[in-house]
């Protein structure tokens, strides 16, 4: 598929041929869902924790005699049945991550790129070269192009001036091509790729 290439100041800079195997697929919601779930589960801290029966600080003395009180048989004040007792089978620190085959991850990225292309939310710019690392320059480019919440993906390395200038802008994320991932692509309204970014992604996903 062919796509127009623009400059940062919204001028024309020719066109580019995008691989149909990467940008022209019919997006599959099930694949995207699987990959996003995998990403979010891997990022989850898993630090949730409660005190169990063995963790609660109480005397281990039997609270009252076994027989003759008319009450139920109890040995420990730590039991979950008592107020301030331990929690039965409560959450403990653990990893929520699970495995997902590399082929599924790569296919998910292709479908995320295809989804943006199909929705008309994919933009290709010539380069991210700016003279100085000035936030105003990037803010002007974002405004002129009508971008609201945007993810910008460059080649192997992001233009340093652009990355520094974009740091203070809310709703503008900048990644190198190796950092491209399904979750970040889908959570932003517009995906902006540089020519170098397109080449790097196509080489990565061949």
UniProtKB/Swiss-Prot annotation:
Pfam families with a match to the protein in the record: Ribosomal_L4 (PF00573)
GO CC terms of this entry: ribonucleoprotein complex; ribosome
Keyword annotations: Ribonucleoprotein, Ribosomal protein, RNA-binding, rRNA-binding
One GO biological process term: translation
SUPFAM superfamilies per record: Ribosomal protein L4 (SSF52166)
GO molecular function, one term: structural constituent of ribosome
InterPro entries in the cross-refs: Ribosomal_uL4 (IPR002136), Ribosomal_uL4-like (IPR013005), Ribosomal_uL4_dom_sf (IPR023574)
Subunit structure: Part of the 50S ribosomal subunit.
PANTHER family named in the record: 50S RIBOSOMAL PROTEIN L4, LARGE RIBOSOMAL SUBUNIT PROTEIN UL4M
Role played: One of the primary rRNA binding proteins, this protein initially binds near the 5'-end of the 23S rRNA. It is important during the early stages of 50S assembly. It makes multiple contacts with different domains of the 23S rRNA in the assembled 50S subunit and ribosome. Forms part of the polypeptide exit tunnel.
Database matches in NCBIfam families: rplD_bact (TIGR03953)
Similarity section: Belongs to the universal ribosomal protein uL4 family.
Protein name as it appears in the record: Large ribosomal subunit protein uL4
């Amino acid at each position: 598929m062919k796509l127009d290439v623009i400059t940062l100041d919204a001028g024309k800079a020719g066109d580019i041929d995008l691989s149909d195997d990467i940008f022209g697929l019919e997006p599959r919601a099930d694949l995207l869902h699987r990959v996003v779930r995998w990403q979010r589960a891997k990022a989850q801290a898993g630090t949730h924790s409660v005190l169990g029966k063995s963790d609660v600080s109480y005397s281990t003395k039997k609270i009252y005699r076994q027989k003759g009180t008319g009450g139920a048989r109890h040995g420990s004040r730590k039991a979950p049945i008592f107020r301030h007792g331990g929690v039965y089978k409560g959450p403990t620190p653990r990893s929520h991550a699970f495995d997902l085959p590399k082929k599924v991850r790569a296919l998910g990225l292709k479908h995320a790129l295809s989804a943006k292309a199909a929705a008309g939310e994919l933009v290709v710019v010539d380069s991210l070269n700016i003279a100085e690392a000035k936030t105003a320059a990037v803010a002007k480019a974002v405004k002129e192009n009508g971008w609201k919440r945007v993810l910008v993906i460059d080649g192997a390395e992001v233009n340093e001036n652009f990355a520094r200038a974009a740091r203070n802008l809310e709703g503008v994320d900048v990644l190198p091509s190796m950092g491209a991932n399904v979750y970040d692509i889908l959570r932003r309204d517009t995906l902006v790729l540089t020519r170098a970014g397109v080449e790097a992604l196509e080489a990565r996903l061949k």
